Amino acid sequence: MNIDPVALKIGLLEIRWYSLAYIIGILFAYWYVQKIDKYKVFTPESYKSIISWWVTGMILGGRIGYILFYNLNFYMSFPIEMFKLWKGGMSFHGASLGLFCTMYIFCKKYKIKFLSAIDLCLCAVPVGIFLGRIANFINGELYGKVTNTRFGMIFQNSGDFFYRHPSQLYEAFFEGLLLFVVMNLLFFFTKVKSYQGMLFSIFMIWYGIVRFFIEFVREPDVQVGYILFNWITMGQLLSFIMVILGICILRLSRMSHNI
């Protein structure tokens, strides 16, 4: 499989599929959150700057997370490379942490309930995950392990001609499309949204479990490999922590609702 990672080129300007995924995902989230914000969790004033907060949190968190979790030695040796975002190198777990941190500060500034705001935003986030994984697939990166199944595909970036799991598509479906459906069914057709932080916890647990198991068929990052027992990857460790935090948030959400 070999698709040009550049979606559009105008003179010297190149717009890559990955950048396009970010742009469309953020714009969709901005539109969708306003559409479903029936209880006015966000104020009209806060909507004017929320995109800049989202972008700051995701880019800083994603980049710092990738540096710390996946390639610290390289960036310590060549620190200038930290700023070359166009070369790639983003971490979903880092981007999530960055987004949660900036949203916490944002909510404090505009006097918005943090958990309610996160619950609302996470109803839209899976679409961004879906688009991001499709961009990974187009770029031929984050491909899976060698397989004999009929789902196997050849990725030129792997450096060989073995059939591999299209793990990006597995993630696009289970972490993106399916999670979007689940989150919104719960939001619109159950009383879950009355429990502040409940959707937050469900997102954390769902994503963490799905990512943990898909990592078994995803090729580990070559510079990291396996970090525990010769089968646990960094992505699995971070996803496990994500599940634990999700369970803690779930318990706190239920306790606070009962008080």
Curated annotation (Swiss-Prot):
Cell membrane is among the record's keywords: yes
Pathway linked to the protein: Protein modification; lipoprotein biosynthesis (diacylglyceryl transfer)
Enzyme's top EC category: transferase
Binding residues annotated for a 1,2-diacyl-sn-glycero-3-phospho-(1'-sn-glycerol), in chain numbering: R133
Location of this chain's protein in the cell: Cell inner membrane
Membrane topology type: Multi-pass membrane protein
A Gene Ontology term for the protein's cellular component: plasma membrane
Highest taxon of the lineage: Bacteria
Protein role: Catalyzes the transfer of the diacylglyceryl group from phosphatidylglycerol to the sulfhydryl group of the N-terminal cysteine of a prolipoprotein, the first step in the formation of mature lipoproteins.
Name of the protein this chain belongs to: Phosphatidylglycerol--prolipoprotein diacylglyceryl transferase
Organism the protein comes from: Ehrlichia ruminantium (strain Welgevonden)
Gene assigned in the entry: lgt
